[in-house]
């Protein structure tokens, strides 16, 4: 029998089925760098508008992990999506270079080397070198992810110009009257020996003593109440702060019950406390809390007076309704102390140990000196004697240092604060507080997901003043001078601008290197002896929070517009970078420095647990890239609901690889089947079949859905729509139905050429939608298809832009054939019947079949294509409703070329194939 294989259009493509991504991607990326791909993104000729994504800086310490990859890949997808829409792109990656983790690394290294480094300039130099080293490491690791940005000129918070910009932002805060030095309690990390801002605190479960203590009322107070004995009962989980108690806070207008044994508690809590055995059950007298105000009790620990006050923070859900108050160790206590002019006692040093103040003020005996407060609690509880009514242990959520993961304490120190509730002048001349301005600004910002808006609002509503000062060395100094004659800071513009200029030229190391005289402008140098330097450094959240100024505003738009269009970070940044950026933006410009906030979740293991080396559940980013390639990692990011935590394991990446293969193999099939197309056919109109119109309409519907989802940054929804189209309509229906024409019709056959145009349109849309995600792969697709490049008028991936399929194909509309759904329903029923015949060995495949249908209205050619049968006819006899067709073996012979049963003679080509063979 004659062999006809060579007469078929079995086209191939040099685009490989296997991507070999880990080998090929670095070559592609090197080409992009050589061709300055990002500069092309910045200088788009068909510019439809500008788009700025402002990068929240990662910390320049350590290697990248999968969480970094998630963040940078999402940003890259957003940026590239905007670029392919036709926008000019601004995206400058940056690094946060100052701060405690680097200091700790250097201190640990010095400890191992058994050396000390008292010189702050040399110490800062080592910190700077450490940051430089890891900045370069991380930069190269980011590039492996296929991300593009201005990596040639990234921003670094330790650059001299940047440090000067941070300082100038601080100066603006001071000039607007929002920067104040205050002695008040703040979070204190005894492990770091430094103040902490709220954003540097994390909450974890901690076991603490829970004690109920009786404070006996003084004689004069008992007389006023006309009772013989009464003790207010307080509840606390911080017995170590009892030494500093100066007051007890009650709830205003609440009823307090005095028991038979003389214990005074909130009546609303009496029954619960009696059940616990804290107090006895019989009530002998009731008092309104307002009548107890200004009475005095005695602290059983040191016999000092404790004033009875009324506080709005007192609740009646837990405890006793009487709150132990130590203004030196609690923020609410501190503000209550301002109202009642209470003494602020604080005798705990930087290491969390009792200092000599306990002796001078007769707060504790000498044996407690130098003892850590947590260690001392057992002795303090014992010292309470009969005043201790109940001791338990509870496990509760407690603030910890986010760097050392050790518990923190509240400790009153002199620090610098940005005031949240101090009115300042707005651009329109009105006066508002920072809290008010920030809350108003949030309303004008779009959040993805929308729940982020309320989350940030709640945090701003409840946050305390921002503690800016840190007692460390590696950071931007709080570079102000205190005038010793007035004990007030010097905020004169001439002085502040002189310091800023020094920082810009020589870096802020000069604050440690230069004398006061050398730091002052000439007109102030004669009075240098009257000034002293503030030696705190700035909270690093102020560094990163002012990046919009240093990157966008200071460059006057060269690196993007302010406010930026989008910022995109992990959901933990509601309490970190989102807040610090918002507050500084509202101080400097009375508005948020961003228009849209997108947040993502965290990377967890397949059980939903946080990854850690100790658990052994860490998935290595480097190993993933080597095994799967960056495009698969990128697809994994896009194919997940990033707004929630992302579960990860090798299994998930294997699944993603299957998705990748589906897209890749589909593109390979498309490329192969229009590879022999004459480029002249691209410009003319074609006669598209009903089946072509069906798939083009499906493509249009898919495009609308994907575009809509991608516009909302819902990449997983968009990709699922795209994958459903590829799997169902394209692979499941259209491509199978077209194979006969593609392989067996003449190359110049109009029907075949129309199909090729449709395949080109589909490939174009796939490339457009996948390019922001699978950028390497789409670049490879275009490298291997001259026809597709000509159709798109693109020489590479960065020439891609959205196309109108109807315009490209010279079609006014897509007309899906009538009764098409009925044909699809027929196809489904047919496949069931075909499976039965195969099992009974009646036929081997659909090509052996012929079918008769009851309705003439159904297009016979369309049925033949969709069902891939060899003959379709209309039944002469009436058919039953189910099934509405008759299936039987085709009455003709198998064509040895196309394999359809249409030949009138055995081993002879059918009429269609004979015609094609004549043309060859």
UniProtKB/Swiss-Prot annotation:
Catalyzes the attachment of isoleucine to tRNA(Ile). As IleRS can inadvertently accommodate and process structurally similar amino acids such as valine, to avoid such errors it has two additional distinct tRNA(Ile)-dependent editing activities. One activity is designated as 'pretransfer' editing and involves the hydrolysis of activated Val-AMP. The other activity is designated 'posttransfer' editing and involves deacylation of mischarged Val-tRNA(Ile). Monomer. Belongs to the class-I aminoacyl-tRNA synthetase family. IleS type 1 subfamily. ATP binds at residue 613. PROSITE patterns: AA_TRNA_LIGASE_I. The gene is ileS. Its cofactor is Zn(2+). A motif ('KMSKS' region) lies at residues 610-614. Keywords: Aminoacyl-tRNA synthetase, ATP-binding, Cytoplasm, Ligase, Metal-binding, Nucleotide-binding, Protein biosynthesis, Zinc. It is found in: Cytoplasm. A motif ('HIGH' region) lies at residues 58-68. IleRS has two distinct active sites: one for aminoacylation and one for editing. The misactivated valine is translocated from the active site to the editing site, which sterically excludes the correctly activated isoleucine. The single editing site contains two valyl binding pockets, one specific for each substrate (Val-AMP or Val-tRNA(Ile)). Its EC number is 6.1.1.5. This is Isoleucine--tRNA ligase. L-isoleucyl-5'-AMP binds at residue 569. Gene3D superfamilies: 1.10.730.20, HUPs, Ile-tRNA synthetase CP2 domain-like. One of its GO terms (molecular function) is aminoacyl-tRNA deacylase activity. It catalyses: tRNA(Ile) + L-isoleucine + ATP = L-isoleucyl-tRNA(Ile) + AMP + diphosphate. GO terms for cellular component: cytosol.
